[in-house]
């Protein structure tokens, strides 16, 4: 009888050890900057403050958009974004990346991304002020998945459009 109890105890301990080892392999560290939206992933890489076309302060977010779907997709038609500050939705901003070509910072949003590929996209919104936190919500365009990040504008750097290599001056 005593030998049966010892065998049963050993078996129970072996099963417990087996379950604890299996759990170790499945643990993943969550990246708070990674947002999964169904077939798409967004990785928040950072933000800065730039002037829009009217000289107002705008927050410019930089994200990696990964298409894990089966067909080509663009950020513009796959993700719905909303930025809020002080409880008010922020307006989209026109921020030029190049004054000579009138290219804006959001041009990457139109890029068709093949399945498994990633493209860097930027998005720009007018700030109400440069001190209050901004909450960015990203949702599947036609789905239920969403994710949020909060950004402190007071910790962001100010940036200007890329240097003009033609020798001209920005307006």
Where do the PLM segments sit?
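Bacterial N-terminal signal peptides that target proteins for export
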Residues: 1-11
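C-terminal motif of bacterial Sec signal peptides marking the signal peptidase cleavage site
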Residues: 20-23
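Low-complexity, acidic Ser/Thr/Pro/Gly-rich terminal tails and inter-domain linkers that flank the onset
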Residues: 28-55, 171
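A structural connector/turn signal
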Residues: 30, 108-109, 122
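The feature marks short-to-medium sequence segments in extracytoplasmic or secretory-pathway proteins
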Residues: 53, 66-117
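Short, well-ordered beta-strand segments enriched in hydrophobic/aromatic residues
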Residues: 59-67
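Short, surface-exposed ligand- or partner-binding patches at beta-edge/loop junctions that are enriched
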Residues: 119-151
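Ser/Thr/Gly/Pro-rich low-complexity, disordered linker/stalk segments of secreted
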Residues: 160-171
């Amino acid at each position: 009888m005593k030998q049966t109890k010892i065998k049963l105890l050993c078996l129970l301990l072996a099963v417990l050890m087996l379950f604890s080892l299996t759990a170790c392999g499945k643990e993943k560290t969550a990246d708070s900057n990674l947002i999964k939206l169904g077939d798409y992933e967004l990785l928040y890489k950072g933000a800065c403050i730039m002037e829009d076309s009217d000289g107002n302060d705008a927050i410019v977010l930089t994200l990696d958009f990964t298409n894990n779907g089966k067909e080509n997709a663009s950020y513009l038609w796959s993700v719905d974004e909303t930025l809020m500050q002080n409880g008010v939705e922020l307006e989209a901003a026109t921020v030029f990346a190049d004054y000579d070509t009138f290219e804006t910072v959001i041009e990457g949003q139109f890029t068709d991304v093949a399945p498994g590929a990633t493209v860097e996209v930027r998005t720009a919104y007018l700030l109400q002020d440069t001190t209050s936190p901004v909450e960015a919500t990203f949702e599947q365009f036609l789905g239920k998945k969403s994710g949020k990040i909060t950004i402190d504008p007071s910790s962001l750097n100010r940036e200007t459009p890329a240097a003009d290599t033609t020798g001209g001056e920005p307006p």
